[in-house]
Amino acid sequence: MNYSQKLKRLQERQQPDYKQYSLDKAFSAEDYKSEIEEAQEYVTRAMEELPARSTEISYEEGNRVKQHLKEELPNYGFNPDFEYQGSVPCNTHIKFHSDIDLLVIIDKFETVENAARIRNRYTGDPKEDLTRLRAACIKILKENYTVADIEKNSKSIKISGGSLRRQIDVVPANWYNSENWYNYNLDYYRGIQIFDSKTKERYKNFPFLNIHLIDEKDRQTCGLYRPLVRLAKTLKEDSESNINISSYDIQALLYNMDNSNFFQNVKDTLIYTTDYLYKTVQNPYKYQSLVVPDGTRRIAEKVDINEVKKLFNEFYTLSNELGII
């Protein structure tokens, strides 16, 4: 796929109603752009933040779903907390129609990292209560969004279409009170456990700490980290290879890059990013040591090193096209 085609796809993702690039266009001498000029424009546009209105709509639709659940879940015996997680709160999303994750955090119990802090023991069944919460969410969504598509995955309930302008991923969970949350009294240290309805297991993570650390990384790199993540996600999206790396793991992979490798000069940042990915795939032992920002797992637990190699190939091809390596 050439950069004229990639630019068109990128534009349609960012502003689907705005058609600037056409594959059918007959280029005149004035219109003609060289491949390197198109590659430069591709990088510039890929790193840009999406229009604010796009993000606002994602939250508006998330709040619509949240309000229905908030009003009706008490009828089923639940008064949960609601929070957002994922690439939209991190501001690393690349699609105008980005979906948004809505956490529905049960009020029946909390998991405490340090059992010595438990004062009133919970006598119910966490798995049963979370199963009931999930079932209630599904019922409420079906009743309120009769023409929407509802897809039930093991960890989330995806609702889209109908009157909704965005896909909303409803994620049942419970609070996980870490020792750091108690010691430092900072909300972002409070974690969650996401419920898997198939295995009945609960999986710990710290989405608010992740958002905080992404903010910090971007600040420490003078605002270059988020644009680089957007570029990497865009390269994955437009790749002719099927790159099996989640948005979360792309963030994590680049989070592990040393801050000294980020430069105001985008070309230098691309050079060092390409070099970083090359060294990563050449050193499997080093790759095995890389962890996600919140420290809950190694990247390699979910991402095969060959997928990282595919991402490296995209950066290498782009850097070569730009004539910087």
Regions from the language model: what does each represent?
Residues 3-40, 285-325:
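Terminal (often C-terminal) interaction modules
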Residues 79-81, 155-157, 250, 288-291:
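Residue-level recognition of the N-termini of beta-strands and the immediately preceding loop/turn
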Residues 79-90, 146-151, 158:
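A short acidic/basic microdomain associated with nuclease active sites
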Residues 87-107, 158-173:
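Histidine-centered divalent-metal-coordination microenvironment in nucleic-acid enzymes
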Residues 71, 75, 106, 238, ...:
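Amphipathic alpha-helical interaction surfaces
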Residues 59, 63, 124-283, 316, ...:
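Catalytic cores of NTP-dependent nucleotidyl/adenyl transfer enzymes across multiple folds
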Residues 62, 85-88, 100-104, 249-254:
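Long, contiguous hydrophobic alpha-helical segments, chiefly transmembrane helices and signal peptides
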Residues 1-83, 89-97, 109-126:
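N-terminal regions immediately upstream of nucleotidyltransferase
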